[in-house]
């Protein structure tokens, strides 16, 4: 109902996805972890993969990945395949926007607790902006100074935490307290310089 009411284009898109069985979103034993959208050019179709577990995170994932998929569905109609291949700088614009475009329908998922979800979503977005910016600045500093030792890299992270997240207190988590929290961010390893795109 949400995508049906959002716009005629999203209704057409979601019907296409459902009719084509283009979602694999329910968790099952031995299923690969993660959530993503990929485009299947031979079929002119987006495909969404996820692992729903009955939490509010499922709504975050489906709205986010449907943002990617809707972009793929719309641009995939162009007969020149290269036109549908968007840049890294714009890829997350569609997905992050869709998370907020669908807010008027959150009562369908959360009933009387929709306000709690929306408040949490806004808090997460506000907290994420400095964190995403910090990850990006960290990468620039590291790549601009490849000779930095592991301890110097940790010192850079700690310095940036004082700027972007001065409230951060790791308590007894000594590993993170000595500047190692960045190692949790797989984008730094797998997709360098992509993280700022979630903030744009």
Label each residue range with its predicted role:
Residues 1-200:
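Cation-handling catalytic/transport regions enriched in His/Asp/Glu
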């Amino acid at each position: 109902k949400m995508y049906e009411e959002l716009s005629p284009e999203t209704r057409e898109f979601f019907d296409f996805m459902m009719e084509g069985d283009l979602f694999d979103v329910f968790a099952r034993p031995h299923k690969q972890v993660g959530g993503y959208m990929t485009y299947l050019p031979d079929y002119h179709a987006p495909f969404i993969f996820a692992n729903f577990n009955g939490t509010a995170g499922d709504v975050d994932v489906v709205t986010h990945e449907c943002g990617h998929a809707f972009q793929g569905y719309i641009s995939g109609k162009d007969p020149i395949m290269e036109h549908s291949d968007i840049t890294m700088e714009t890829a997350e614009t569609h997905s992050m926007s869709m998370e907020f475009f669908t807010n008027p329908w959150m009562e369908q998922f959360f009933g009387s607790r929709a306000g709690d979800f929306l408040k949490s979503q806004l808090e997460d977005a506000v907290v994420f902006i400095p964190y995403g910016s910090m990850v990006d600045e960290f990468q620039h500093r590291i790549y601009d100074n490849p000779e930095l030792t592991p301890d110097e890299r940790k010192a850079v992270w700690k310095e940036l935490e004082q700027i972007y997240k001065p409230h951060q207190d790791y308590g007894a988590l000594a590993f993170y307290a000595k500047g190692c929290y960045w190692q949790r961010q797989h984008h730094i390893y797998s997709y360098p310089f992509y993280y700022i795109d979630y903030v744009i």
